[in-house]
Amino acid sequence: MYQKLKKFFEYEAAGGIVLALAAIAAMIVANSPLHDWYESFIHAPVVVQVGELIISKDAHHWINDGLMAVFFFLVGLELKREVLIGELSNINQIVLPAAAAVGGMIAPALVYVAFNASHPEYLAGWAIPAATDIAFAIGILSLLGSRVPNSLKIFLVSIAIFDDIGAILIIALFYTSDLSLLSLLIAGLCLPFLYLLNRRNVTAITPYLFFGIIMWIAVLKSGIHATLAGVILALFIPMVNTDDPEHSPLEDLEHDLHGTVAFAILPLFAFANAGISLQGAGFGQLLHSVPFGIAAGLFIGKQVGIMLMTWSIIKAGLASLPNGTNFKQIYGVSLLCGVGFTMSLFISGLAFGGVTEGFDPRLGIILGSIISGIAGYMLLKRTLKEDTATGITALDLTR
């Protein structure tokens, strides 16, 4: 188990570094003589036609609606595995991170609403600071090396998992356009076939992908965000191969997708969405209630919500601190959870459709994430060093 966790954290750390480089590259290109090339790249028309079916979108939409569906598919696979055999399979293990995640989503939203209450047209962005980017958060935590207790890493991952569940529900419930009942019906008709494949222990991925693609197209046309098709499809991938119990179709697929998602899809998403032109930008734009509310939600709301819920649950006797940790370290993790980059950018696109005249929500996302990441790293670096000196050691998962 220790080796699996170590491999996972190393993978996420590397992915976080590549993600950061892609975001930096996007900002450099967007503020260089290559700006026009960047704009033409993300807005280049891409048309796919199969018979009478025509899907015409620009590259930006194909990345956000198409490639990100693969990311959400991987998220769905991870959620299913964690619920069946992982950290979420034991109710005693999930109370604290679940409560922390709820607090860490409600408080940032309230902070954002407080800054934008007098502007109803801006309230659509309330969910932007509610998200946590696990790749960046784990990447930052991994910079501290072996001093970090594995229980603290697991706590952070568990919060991020519940955060993903919350983000998926938010997108499904609050960021949908006018619904097409016919498209929803077609998407719904795929579910019995997927269920039948699962019950018959079909382990080949091709039949699932066939119905998954049909469902994705139907959901795309329905008004619900198409990436949710990826989550739904993941729930039907079998965890166990009854003919070969040593191999898990779900875990094999999860392993195969990790590299593609971490080192191709997410960096491409970051490159296509983080290209903020700073020409003409100043404190006035940064202090606009939308980006400022997002930054405050990520930095202030996240830590307040997570710490308040964690403290309340522990004081109520419903849970205890993760082994080998203390409240200072939990506070450091709450700061890292303010790194909302990927999912925040994604929800921002749904809420405002990109850059809006007079403000750019991405400024708040990047500023809030940077401040949260640096503050979390500095605090954990100091507290873990202090705790190591007083004899607190990392949890040994090999026992």
UniProtKB/Swiss-Prot annotation:
The chain crosses the membrane at residues 14-34, 59-79, 94-114, 123-143, 154-174, 177-197, 204-224, 261-281, 294-314, 335-355, 359-379. GO terms for cellular component: plasma membrane. GO terms for molecular function: sodium:proton antiporter activity. GO terms for biological process: regulation of pH. Its main location: membrane. It is found in: Cell inner membrane. It catalyses: Na(+)(in) + 2 H(+)(out) = Na(+)(out) + 2 H(+)(in). Keywords: Antiport, Cell inner membrane, Cell membrane, Ion transport, Membrane, Sodium, Sodium transport, Transmembrane, Transmembrane helix, Transport. It is a multi-pass membrane protein. Belongs to the NhaA Na(+)/H(+) (TC 2.A.33) antiporter family. Na(+)/H(+) antiporter that extrudes sodium in exchange for external protons. PANTHER family: NA(+)_H(+) ANTIPORTER NHAA, SODIUM ION/PROTON ANTIPORTER NHAA-RELATED. This is Na(+)/H(+) antiporter NhaA. The gene is nhaA.
